[in-house]
């Protein structure tokens, strides 16, 4: 397995590099950064090698400048984490125009070098996923973003804590924008296979408070420690494992939709997808209730507006 991380010197990129390097499937890990970050990346490589000492990992780690991307050839997955980081008080959409130029540049270069899968992490992730898809001209199954996968995990944890059950008993997800217009799917939430609405405590569930906490978790972490890294890195690892092991799990990622949800088209947005060796094998259409459809359509319209603005940058 060969994985490339573009933007590996950043918080999420470096944390992801460590987690991936520890995996037994990892053979070649390529860390890409701008020229001024090469020393930091070389230090990261040596630090990771120290962490791997005495483990079963035999990953080869390579460091290269983004001026020489030929090294990414034959990568199974290219992860893009590059971009201007979000600061406290800054919305994800504020980042769109600046980061679109960065992501678009890399997407074009990747497409020139290899036929691979592009996994976008850069925020606002739905808009950046669309930009990477448009500029790479890859098939829709090859380009996807982290989307609301981490948001869904945070929501799952909150539900488990409220009902006092093991997290594995909870099945739920959040769709839509990775941002303010995200949509929790209570209609598709269950505990131990039982619809959540059938539990007596459901009427006490502070759903608005929980969703607000999920929405602002990233900003909370930025305020407390400068930025998140471990949560996103673990979520990224989940997705890469699905690809490597051809797990065909249903994850909520940012994917291009073409009418699967209420006729919405030409936008990348967080939806349930079946993910395996070929990337997105299927955008899984599910039945939403009336309020969820309205909220999802609103979310798609918000993303689409920004996609149109950055499409030709």
Curated annotation (Swiss-Prot):
GO-annotated biological processes: lactate metabolic process; pyruvate metabolic process; tricarboxylic acid cycle
A single cellular component GO annotation: cytoplasm
Localization per Swiss-Prot or TrEMBL: Cytoplasm
Alphabetic keyword roster: Cytoplasm, NAD, NADP, Oxidoreductase, Tricarboxylic acid cycle
Binding site for substrate: 86, 92, 123, 154
Protein name: L-2-hydroxycarboxylate dehydrogenase (NAD(P)(+))
Primary role: Catalyzes the reversible oxidation of (S)-malate and (S)-sulfolactate to oxaloacetate and sulfopyruvate, respectively. Can use both NADH and NADPH, although activity is higher with NADPH. Oxidation of (S)-sulfolactate is observed only in the presence of NADP(+). Can also oxidize tartrate. Cannot reduce pyruvate, nor alpha-ketoglutarate.
Transmembrane annotation, as ranges: none
NCBIfam families in UniProt: PRK06223.1
Species: Methanocaldococcus jannaschii (strain ATCC 43067 / DSM 2661 / JAL-1 / JCM 10045 / NBRC 100440) (Methanococcus jannaschii)
The reaction(s) this protein catalyses: a (2S)-2-hydroxycarboxylate + NAD(+) = a 2-oxocarboxylate + NADH + H(+); a (2S)-2-hydroxycarboxylate + NADP(+) = a 2-oxocarboxylate + NADPH + H(+)
EC number: 1.1.1.375
Matching Pfam families: Ldh_1_C, Ldh_1_N
Gene3D superfamilies to which the protein is assigned, alphabetical: Lactate dehydrogenase/glycoside hydrolase, family 4, C-terminal, NAD(P)-binding Rossmann-like Domain
UniProt GO MF annotations: L-2-hydroxycarboxylate dehydrogenase (NAD+) activity; L-lactate dehydrogenase activity
């Amino acid at each position: 397995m060969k994985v490339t991380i573009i933007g590996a010197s950043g918080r999420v990129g470096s944390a992801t590099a460590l987690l991936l390097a520890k995996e037994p499937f990892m053979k070649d890990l390529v860390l890409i950064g701008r020229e001024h970050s090469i020393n930091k990346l070389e230090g990261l490589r040596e630090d990771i090698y120290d962490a791997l000492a005495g483990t079963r990992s035999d990953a080869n780690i390579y460091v290269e400048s983004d001026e020489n991307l030929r090294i990414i050839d034959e990568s199974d997955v290219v992860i893009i984490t590059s971009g201007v980081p979000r600061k406290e008080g800054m919305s994800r959409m504020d980042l769109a125009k600046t980061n679109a130029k960065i992501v678009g540049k890399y997407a074009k270069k990747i497409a020139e070098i290899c036929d691979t899968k592009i996994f976008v992490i850069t925020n606002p992730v739905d808009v950046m996923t669309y930009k990477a898809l448009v500029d790479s001209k890859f098939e829709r199954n090859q380009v996807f973003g982290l989307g609301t996968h981490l948001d869904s995990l945070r929501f799952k944890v909150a539900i488990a804590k409220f009902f006092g059950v093991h997290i594995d008993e909870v099945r739920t997800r959040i769709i839509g924008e990775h941002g303010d217009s995200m949509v929790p799917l209570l209609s598709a939430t269950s505990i131990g296979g039982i619809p959540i609405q059938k539990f007596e405590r459901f009427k006490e569930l502070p759903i608005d408070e929980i969703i607000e906490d999920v929405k602002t978790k990233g900003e909370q972490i930025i305020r407390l420690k400068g930025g998140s890294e471990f949560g996103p890195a673990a979520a990224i690892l989940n997705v890469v494992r699905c690809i490597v092991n051809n797990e065909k799990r249903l994850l909520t990622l940012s994917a291009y939709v073409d009418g699967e949800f209420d006729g919405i088209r030409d936008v990348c947005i967080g939806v349930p997808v079946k993910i395996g060796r070929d990337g997105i094998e299927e955008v899984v259409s599910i039945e939403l209730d009336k309020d969820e459809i309205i909220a999802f359509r609103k979310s798609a319209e918000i993303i689409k507006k920004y996609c149109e603005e950055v499409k030709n940058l």
